[in-house]
Regions:
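Active-site-adjacent beta-strand/loop module that shapes the phosphate/pyrophosphate-binding cleft
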Residues: 69-91, 101, 124
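NUDIX/MutT-family hydrolases
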Residues: 84, 93-124
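Generic C-terminal helix-cap and adjacent flexible tail
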Residues: 1, 125-132
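A conserved beta-turn-beta hairpin within the catalytic core of GNAT-like acetyltransferases
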Residues: 26-30
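Conserved N-terminal beta-strand and adjoining loop/helix that marks the start
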Residues: 1-17, 37
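The catalytic Nudix box helix
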Residues: 33-65, 104
Length: 132
């Protein structure tokens, strides 16, 4: 089975977490933490900065490395590096997603996330409880 390595941004603003809704593929309409695949020779940190610029036309600053999770989808194995980030600019544009919103940490369990993204929820809750 093929392994795909990605990075995701857990962007927190005023105690709320930024999530995006997929507009394509088998998991269309599911929610996720924005990010994408590492390019050859690229670090997970460089990947997340690039992906957020490509997907949202926004600049971010990485605050800290949150976690890495692994999940096996039917056709590939995913390794996802998760970073706590903050927006450096107030402007964002949805270039690849159907929708986006900031949600309260208490809402996370009720959102229809992609299977791999669900595995990050406990790490996010712990990070917020410890004030990052």
């Amino acid at each position: 089975m093929k392994t795909v390595t990605v990075s995701s941004a857990v962007t927190i603003k005023d105690g709320k977490i930024f999530i995006t809704q997929r507009g394509y593929g088998d998991y269309k309409d599911k929610w996720e933490f924005p990010g994408g695949k590492l390019e050859k020779g690229e670090s997970p940190e460089d990947c997340i900065v690039r992906e957020i610029k490509e997907e949202l036309d926004a600049d971010i600053r990485i605050i800290k490395y949150l976690s890495a999770i692994e999940y096996s989808y039917p056709t590939f194995h995913l390794i996802m590096h998760n970073f706590v980030c903050e927006l450096k600019s107030s402007y964002m544009s949805l270039l690849e997603h159907e929708a986006a919103k900031f949600v309260d940490v208490n809402e996370l369990d009720s959102i229809d996330f992609l299977p791999a993204d669900k595995l990050v929820l406990e790490d996010i809750k712990k990070a917020i409880e410890s004030h990052l």
